Amino acid sequence: MDVTRLLLATLLVFLCFFTAYSHPPPEEKLRDDRSLRSNSSVNLLDFPSVSIVALNKNSKQISRKEAEKKRSSKKEASMKKVARPRTPLSAPCVATRDSCKSPAPACCDPCASCQCRFFRSACSCRVLSLNC
């Protein structure tokens, strides 16, 4: 029983100590700007001044129009990449994700290549780039 009581008393003292020192100290109340300047560790003159500029409706509309133009140009560029003609397929070829060991013919997909793993024991046709 004495060991249990000693353990509980130690735990209680530790919790009181932890509770007392975990709270931040109360802040000093500053009376005026002079005490603020003398007590502050950061000098306010070190930071550049901030200027606030009001935006009018025209500037907002221009920025929206520019954003829409950028979006449409990106879509057109991606469409141009997709619309590229592909080479005609040869009859004896290996489908994507099928085995393509050295006696096998080339991959059917022009964007795919034969990729081997485990010291060339397991080979398969895989598409490496999506933008092909």
Curated annotation (Swiss-Prot):
<feature type="glycosylation site" description="N-linked (GlcNAc...) asparagine">
    <location>
        <position position="39"/>
    </location>
</feature>
<dbReference type="GO" id="GO:0032438">
    <property type="term" value="P:melanosome organization"/>
</dbReference>
<keyword id="KW-0964">Secreted</keyword>
<feature type="disulfide bond">
    <location>
        <begin position="100"/>
        <end position="114"/>
    </location>
</feature>
<feature type="disulfide bond">
    <location>
        <begin position="116"/>
        <end position="123"/>
    </location>
</feature>
<feature type="disulfide bond">
    <location>
        <begin position="111"/>
        <end position="132"/>
    </location>
</feature>
<dbReference type="GO" id="GO:0031779">
    <property type="term" value="F:melanocortin receptor binding"/>
</dbReference>
<dbReference type="GO" id="GO:0005184">
    <property type="term" value="F:neuropeptide hormone activity"/>
</dbReference>
<dbReference type="GO" id="GO:0042438">
    <property type="term" value="P:melanin biosynthetic process"/>
</dbReference>
<keyword id="KW-1015">Disulfide bond</keyword>
<feature type="compositionally biased region" description="Basic and acidic residues">
    <location>
        <begin position="63"/>
        <end position="79"/>
    </location>
</feature>
<feature type="signal peptide">
    <location>
        <begin position="1"/>
        <end position="22"/>
    </location>
</feature>
<keyword id="KW-0325">Glycoprotein</keyword>
<dbReference type="InterPro" id="IPR007733">
    <property type="entry name" value="Agouti"/>
</dbReference>
<dbReference type="Pfam" id="PF05039">
    <property type="entry name" value="Agouti"/>
</dbReference>
<feature type="domain" description="Agouti">
    <location>
        <begin position="93"/>
        <end position="132"/>
    </location>
</feature>
<dbReference type="InterPro" id="IPR027300">
    <property type="entry name" value="Agouti_dom"/>
</dbReference>
<protein>
    <recommendedName>
        <fullName>Agouti-signaling protein</fullName>
    </recommendedName>
</protein>
<keyword id="KW-0732">Signal</keyword>
<dbReference type="GO" id="GO:0009755">
    <property type="term" value="P:hormone-mediated signaling pathway"/>
</dbReference>
<feature type="disulfide bond">
    <location>
        <begin position="107"/>
        <end position="125"/>
    </location>
</feature>
<dbReference type="GO" id="GO:0005615">
    <property type="term" value="C:extracellular space"/>
</dbReference>
<feature type="region of interest" description="Disordered">
    <location>
        <begin position="61"/>
        <end position="87"/>
    </location>
</feature>
<dbReference type="InterPro" id="IPR036836">
    <property type="entry name" value="Agouti_dom_sf"/>
</dbReference>
<comment type="function">
    <text>Involved in the regulation of melanogenesis. The binding of ASP to MC1R precludes alpha-MSH initiated signaling and thus blocks production of cAMP, leading to a down-regulation of eumelanogenesis (brown/black pigment) and thus increasing synthesis of pheomelanin (yellow/red pigment).</text>
</comment>
<feature type="disulfide bond">
    <location>
        <begin position="93"/>
        <end position="108"/>
    </location>
</feature>
<keyword id="KW-0960">Knottin</keyword>
